[in-house]
Amino acid sequence: MQTQRSLDECRNEPFTDFSNPANAAAFKAALEKVRSELGREYPIVIGGEKLSLDHKFNSTDPAEKSRVVGVFSEGDTDTSLVDRAIATAGEAFLSWRNVPYAERAEYLFKAAELMRQRKHELSAWMVFEVSKTWAEADGDTAEAIDFCEFYGREMLRWGSEQPVTPNPGEENTFEYIPLGVGAIIPPWNFPLAIMAGMTMAAVVAGNTVVL
């Protein structure tokens, strides 16, 4: 796959002007959509298989703690699922590392476009999940989009064989290679942007992750 992106196209995702009545109305609609989906249970996913543990915990809105945003499985000292996730990611790495770097970059560009299409919805989730203001949530989503665009272009920049200083009688090459499986543990205060940045940087370089 040959990407049509060029290194000089990267621009920061613009923030939403909520003083525009149309933008404010669109965001309110996104909030109502997300509100209707609150309280659902979200399973653990390993290798495409959905798993649920007996013990659960609620993720609640910090501004209104009676509001349950989502229900999640609660782990304990049993690390078997963690071991399984790492092993599964290791298996995926064997094929993912061989995907051409331009194709890996194109996946990030596609992810950025999908996030643009659902920008208000993603931001609305953060209004409930961490009680962000509209502008703070919008900035978080914009930064996540920026990470996709930035790391995709960085992969295009560094993915090919790099120049080396020639030495008489030697034949040298210099290229970056993927290393394996990484663990992504993002902070709570930027639930989309930092998670996206850590994940996209690793994945576009040919690695796999456990998130």
Regions found by a protein language model. Name each.
Residues 44, 156, 176:
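Short glycine- and Lys/Arg-enriched binding-loop motifs that mark or flank ligand-binding interfaces
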Residues 48, 104, 148, 182, ...:
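Residue-level signature of catalytic and energy-coupling elements of molecular machines
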Residues 60-159:
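Glycine-rich loop-to-alpha-helix module at the N-terminal edge of alpha/beta enzyme cores
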Residues 161-211:
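Conserved small-residue-rich beta-alpha loop and adjacent elements
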